[in-house]
Every structure is written in C-alpha cells, then in structure tokens.
Amino acid sequence: MSDILEKILATKTEEVAAARKARPLASLRNDAETRRDIRDFAGALTRCQSAGRAGVIAEIKKASPSKGIIRPDFQPAAIAESYAGHGAACLSVLTDVRYFQGAADYLVAARDACDLPVLRKDFLVDEYQVFEARAMGADCILLIVAALDNARLADFEAIARELGMAVLVETHDAAELDRALRLASPLIGVNNRNLRTFDVSLDTTLSLLPVIQAEGRMAITESGISTPDDVIRMREAGVNSFLVGEAFMREADPGAALAHLFA
C-alpha cells in the first residue's frame, strides 16, 4: 500500500472515531434507514449501455493530493446542473475534506440541483461511513479493494445493498479484481492511476477487461480519460462506462466539456 493511501486511511480512522463520538451510530443508522429517495445508479449506467452510448459518471472535485487545487471557482450545484444538462448518467462527489477539499455539503448541494444518481467518492474504512453516505443522500458508495480486507468489503457491500445503494468496487490489478469478483456488485471500477506511484495507464483497464466481461460485470474505467481518442480506444475495446473528473473540472463549463469529450 502506498504511503499516501496509508496516510489517507489513517486519517479516515481518526475521523470516524471523532464522528462516532459526535453522533452515535444508532442515530445515524436511523436516518440512513428512513430515507426513501434512492436513485438507481447502476440502472442509469445500464440504460446508457442499452442505448449504445457512453455512461458517464461525471465527477465534482475541487482538489487532489497530486494536483492541488483543480477548480478554484467551485460551485457544486452549478457544476451538477451543467453535467445533468449535457448528458451525464450519474455524478461522483468527493466528500473527503483533508486531502481533496471535499465535503458532505457538496454532495447534498449537487444532488439537490439535479435528478442524477450520486456516488459518494471517499475512502471508506468503517461501517459508520456507509450509513453516513445514505444519510447524506448518496445513491452509491465506493469500496476500494486496496484499502479493505475481504471481510470489510463484504460487510460494507451488504450494508449498502440493504440501504438500497449501489456499490462501485474499485480495482487496479488482477489480484484486486479477483477479490472484487467475490462480491455481488455488478459495478467494477478499474482505476488507471496506480495508487502507489500515481502514474496513469489506460492499459490497466484494457488488461482487466476480458475477465470483467467474462464474469458478466460492468467495467467502469476511472482516471486518465482526457481526449476523444481515449474514449474511442475504450469504446472500441468494449468499455461503455467512464468516471471522469479532472478533464471536466479544469474547463469553464464542465458539462460542455463532457459533451465535447463524448461527442
């Protein structure tokens, strides 16, 4: 595991401990279980695939540890509206505060501004965060295989599914993919960014794609998609679902950038 990932996960453990003291799990769990406003995240991507068009999970991200501030003029609601108006299937919103300058309030604002299903993009290390995700309105959570053992992967997936949420299981190599395929979720993300070196290679998705397809799962390529040629390369290989953030966040109109990239 990389130093940066270890650092982030250690921070998350501290944050959850503080959050549990501030608000007991029982209270949070009640809020999560009583929300009835779930939006079909996996279904939105499946409908795009059935229609023969790319299913884009458009990301709302202010900053990252590797790039610093990506979008100084950061208005989550306006960005969400722009994405929704230009063909995004779903949204991804960073809620990590320390490393990505995200916030739960950003997810709430983005979701309130449109009708798209929303992924909570964060580093989950505790069941508390799964209930927290649904309580804040998330329709999908991210489980990073590199960050979790098999028991927690299974537990967090089960809780999410009981709450009606979809689960995007993120992998980077064959060993992680093998572990991801033990779960029930149809959504398999392939992060083209190596979390150990932060280098990006689209070959990562292409190398894992045959196994994902053979298992009847949906491959979602993440990171490094920045040009129409990248999109063409992926689609010709059979990838129909994309998670893209930075390429849009650096443009004045993120939605217009989405429409151009996937024209």
From Swiss-Prot:
The pathway is:
Amino-acid biosynthesis; L-tryptophan biosynthesis; L-tryptophan from chorismate: step 4/5
* One MF term in the entry's GO annotations: indole-3-glycerol-phosphate synthase activity
Q: Which UniProt keywords apply?
A: Amino-acid biosynthesis, Aromatic amino acid biosynthesis, Decarboxylase, Lyase, Tryptophan biosynthesis
One GO biological-process annotation of the entry reads: L-tryptophan biosynthetic process
The answer on whether this UniProt entry bears the keyword Amino-acid biosynthesis reads: yes
User: Which EC numbers does the record give?
Assistant: 4.1.1.48
The protein's superkingdom reads Bacteria
Report which reactions are catalysed by this protein.
1-(2-carboxyphenylamino)-1-deoxy-D-ribulose 5-phosphate + H(+) = (1S,2R)-1-C-(indol-3-yl)glycerol 3-phosphate + CO2 + H2O
Under the heading InterPro entries, the entry gives: Aldolase_TIM (IPR013785), Indole-3-glycerol_P_synth (IPR045186), Indole-3-glycerol_P_synth_dom (IPR013798), Indole-3-GlycerolPSynthase_CS (IPR001468), RibuloseP-bd_barrel (IPR011060)
Matches recorded under Gene3D superfamilies: Aldolase class I
Task: Give the record's family classification.
Answer: Belongs to the TrpC family.
Query: Per its record, how is this protein called by name?
Result: Indole-3-glycerol phosphate synthase
Species assigned in the record: Laribacter hongkongensis (strain HLHK9)
